[in-house]
């Protein structure tokens, strides 16, 4: 049996593909390569000596999905595919709903036709909107999201919940990620944003290597100790291992888990720690807040620990060192 991973050439997807291949699983990847590179999968094969089956296609393309399900004995699906930039989603809401919501419905319909009943959905901590309290548990209120990206994740979660009630023999889990950072310790795969990075750590590493002149810190007037936004940063390899733990522990019905460390760090703290660990100076300017950003957000990961036996093992130092190693080895990402 094989596992279909949509968006498997992307940042989190490629690290998850690697983790599953290393565990001896058979993997099929579907990716349209709009925000990713097939080179990531070539690097995965270099690391572990095994190759996934790769399809260059889109989750909105029913014929492509039918081909995959008819050509492989798919047992379960891990669904990463989708657009993911908070800022861009504010500018292009229709594209986000089309890709993230309609695409997920299309995938689910084709899974039903192929009688594939196990699904892990890549959700996000953005579903919590403006948090009423931190740390966030899975029982916290969702909705009230501040951007279409987050809203699209809320919508898909609700669709999956409703579907699960109508089809109790399906096993569906939504994983709410916090802020993935870092890279595989080999330095061969990592985060390779198109254009200027939207996420903090690749922005920092590109400044450190001289690709960008300075970092932009979006807001220093939040109600936090140093005025900058606080987030729960989690090593991408911990996140990948979280998918393996979820796959092993899938049960019928609909489940939700936070995947985070349970510790929040501010933007300014991240800059200082990176400078301390690497010895690189990171010049930055304070600019106005981005639309849709919130002051602070970090997880309570206790439920995943209790029910999946999973917890984040890697430290902030690991995250920063691995991200920097990836950047130094790949100054232009996968476009070497």
From Swiss-Prot:
Pathway: Carbohydrate metabolism; galactose metabolism. The active site is at 149 (proton acceptor). Its EC number is 5.1.3.2. NAD(+) binds at residues 11-12, 31-36, 58-59, 80-84, 99, 124, 149, 153, 178. GO terms for molecular function: UDP-glucose 4-epimerase activity. GO terms for cellular component: cytosol. Gene3D superfamilies: NAD(P)-binding Rossmann-like Domain (3.40.50.720), UDP-galactose 4-epimerase, domain 1 (3.90.25.10). Keywords: Carbohydrate metabolism, Galactose metabolism, Isomerase, NAD. Its cofactor is NAD(+). InterPro entries: Epimerase_deHydtase, NAD(P)-bd_dom_sf, UDP_G4E. It catalyses: UDP-alpha-D-glucose = UDP-alpha-D-galactose. GO terms for biological process: galactose metabolic process. Substrate binds at residues 124, 149, 179, 199-200, 216-218, 231, 290-293. It holds the Pfam family Epimerase. Disulfide bonds: none annotated. Belongs to the NAD(P)-dependent epimerase/dehydratase family. Involved in the metabolism of galactose. Catalyzes the conversion of UDP-galactose (UDP-Gal) to UDP-glucose (UDP-Glc) through a mechanism involving the transient reduction of NAD. PANTHER family: UDP-GLUCOSE 4-EPIMERASE. Homodimer. This is UDP-glucose 4-epimerase.
């Amino acid at each position: 049996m094989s596992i279909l991973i949509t968006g498997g050439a992307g940042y989190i997807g490629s690290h998850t593909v690697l983790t599953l291949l290393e565990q001896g699983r058979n993997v099929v990847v579907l990716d349209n390569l709009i925000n990713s590179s097939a080179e990531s999968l070539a690097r995965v094969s270099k690391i572990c000596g095994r190759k996934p089956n790769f399809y260059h296609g889109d989750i909105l393309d029913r014929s492509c999905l039918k081909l995959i399900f008819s050509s492989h004995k798919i047992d379960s699906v891990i669904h990463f595919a989708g657009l993911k930039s908070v800022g861009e989603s504010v500018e292009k809401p229709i594209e986000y709903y089309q890709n993230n919501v309609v695409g997920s419905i299309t995938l689910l319909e084709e899974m039903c036709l192929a009688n594939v009943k196990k699904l892990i959905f890549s959700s996000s901590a953005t579903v919590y909107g403006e948090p009423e309290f931190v740390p966030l548990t899975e029982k916290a209120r969702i909705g009230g999201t501040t951007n279409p990206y987050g809203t699209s994740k809320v919508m898909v979660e609700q669709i999956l919940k409703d579907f699960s009630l109508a089809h109790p023999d399906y096993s569906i889990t939504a994983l709410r990620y916090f802020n993935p950072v870092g890279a595989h310790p080999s330095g061969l795969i990592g985060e390779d944003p198109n254009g200027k990075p939207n996420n903090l750590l690749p922005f920092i590493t590109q400044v450190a290597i001289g690709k960008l002149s300075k970092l932009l810190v979006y807001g220093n007037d939040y109600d936090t100790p140093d005025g900058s936004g606080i987030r729960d940063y989690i090593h991408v390899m911990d996140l990948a291992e979280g998918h393996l733990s979820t796959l092993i522990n899938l049960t019928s019905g609909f489940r939700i888990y936070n995947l985070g460390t349970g510790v929040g760090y501010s933007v300014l703290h991240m800059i200082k720690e990176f400078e301390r660990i690497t010895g690189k100076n990171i010049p930055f300017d304070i600019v106005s807040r981005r639309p849709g950003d919130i002051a602070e957000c970090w997880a309570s990961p206790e439920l995943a620990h209790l029910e999946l036996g999973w917890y984040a093992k890697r430290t902030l130092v690991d995250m920063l060192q691995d991200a920097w190693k990836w950047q130094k080895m790949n100054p232009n990402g996968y476009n070497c």
